[in-house]
């Protein structure tokens, strides 16, 4: 999967300004009609206006959800794609119909009334199926998502340079040592030039998680393992204890507003930089803050620059504040929405949700991983527990 998107979120609906103008005009007319109406006519008009507005909001949400479903099922066979699309459209249709039937009288012996029990059972079975399937995803081995990234003026000696991106490992109460061993083994099997960990590596106190973290010592790559903090590292005790532990026990290079140059045998170099998570700006922890300018100091403007930033919103903030060269930002945090009932909130809250984006009017790209594991309940949508293998390619 290699998705290129412009400026993050753009659904078909928002690209068509005539729809916005038409709907605004309709809303204006309804408001004027309500203002001039009296008695029962006013009450009926108000009811119609309420239903129209709710259906409009649901249409916007449905459009976003359907476009996202189409993206998620692209890797599947055509027959499966059609099945998922049909199921999604039927679900959307019945969701809209259920709102209308709230205002339409149905006789006691109507088909819908007689099927009420069946519909309730079907809903419960569907919820159970989706939850069970989501749990199975988190118990299965992570998928390897291979992505080619074209970098402007990438030296030929670095063409084909590979990076394994791991995000949101969330070592904690439900992510045990065996799971980490599985992730490490699958990562090492890719024989990447570099391993990048973009935040949320741990989700607990150091004293409780020493054993589950031990397999991290076996992570291997040609140029080493590089790591930048996420928000969850700041939720448990002293973050510096974790950072010292990673550095001394596992030989992981922690990039706290710093960078390293990785050079090929011909002398061509890539600058890999990382920043503290943007959450530090709210927490006001001494010596912890996001400082992209400092992180990029020492990165030549003539060499490719890769920046580890855990949260996509933090990446957006950096792009608005710096003019220094950044070719590729590696992020996570969103879990690609993780599960159906929270996907919309993740979509609306984050500037970039999942996949490879090219920033408009620049040479900067950002890849947002769906994460190796999960946050909270151990459920996730299909193929969203991922290890990403990024291959850099030369682009003139």
Q: What are these model-derived regions, one by one?
A:
Residues 1-140:
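Non-catalytic terminal accessory segments
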Residues 11-20, 24-40, 48, 93-99, ...:
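Binuclear metal-dependent phosphoesterase catalytic core
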Residues 76-82, 107-119, 144-154, 176-190:
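Alpha-helical membrane-embedding segments
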Residues 153-396:
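Soluble catalytic domains of enzymes that build or remodel membrane lipids, polysaccharides, and related
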């Amino acid at each position: 999967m290699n998705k290129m998107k412009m400026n993050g979120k753009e659904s078909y609906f928002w690209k068509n300004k005539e729809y916005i103008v038409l709907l605004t005009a309709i809303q204006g007319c309804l408001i004027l009609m309500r203002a001039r109406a009296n008695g029962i006519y006013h009450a009926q008009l108000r009811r119609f206006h309420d239903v129209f507005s709710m259906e409009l909001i649901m249409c916007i949400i449905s459009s976003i959800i359907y476009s996202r479903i189409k993206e998620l099922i692209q890797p599947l066979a055509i027959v499966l794609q059609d099945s998922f699309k049909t199921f999604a459209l039927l679900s959307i249709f019945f969701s809209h119909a259920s709102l209308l039937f709230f205002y339409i009288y149905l006789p006691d012996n109507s088909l819908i009334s007689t099927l009420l029990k069946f519909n309730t059972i079907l809903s419960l079975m569907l919820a159970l199926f989706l939850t069970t399937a989501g749990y199975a995803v988190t118990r299965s081995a992570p998928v390897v998502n291979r992505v080619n990234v074209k970098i402007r003026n990438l030296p030929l000696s670095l063409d084909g340079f590979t990076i394994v991106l791991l995000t949101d490992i969330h070592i904690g109460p439900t992510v045990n040592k065996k799971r980490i061993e599985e992730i490490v083994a699958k990562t090492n099997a890719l024989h990447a030039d570099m391993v990048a960990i973009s935040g949320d590596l741990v989700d607990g106190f150091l004293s409780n998680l020493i054993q589950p973290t031990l397999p991290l010592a076996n992570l291997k790559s040609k140029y080493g393992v590089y790591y930048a903090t996420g928000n969850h590292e700041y939720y448990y005790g002293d973050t510096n204890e974790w950072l010292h532990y990673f550095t001394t026990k596992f030989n992981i290079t922690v990039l706290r507003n710093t960078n390293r140059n990785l050079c090929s045998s011909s002398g061509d170099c890539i600058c890999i930089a990382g920043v503290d998570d943007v959450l530090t700006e709210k927490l006001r922890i001494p010596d912890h803050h996001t400082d992209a300018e400092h992180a990029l100091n020492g990165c030549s403007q003539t060499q490719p620059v890769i920046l580890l930033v855990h949260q996509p919103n933090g990446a957006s903030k950096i792009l608005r504040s710096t003019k220094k060269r950044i070719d590729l930002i590696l992020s996570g945090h969103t879990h690609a929405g993780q599960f159906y009932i929270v996907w919309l909130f993740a979509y609306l809250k984050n500037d970039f949700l999942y996949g490879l984006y090219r920033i408009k009017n620049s040479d900067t790209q950002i890849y947002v991983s769906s994460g190796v594991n999960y946050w909270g309940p151990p459920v996730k949508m299909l193929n969203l527990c991922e290890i990403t293998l990024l291959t850099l390619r030369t682009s003139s």
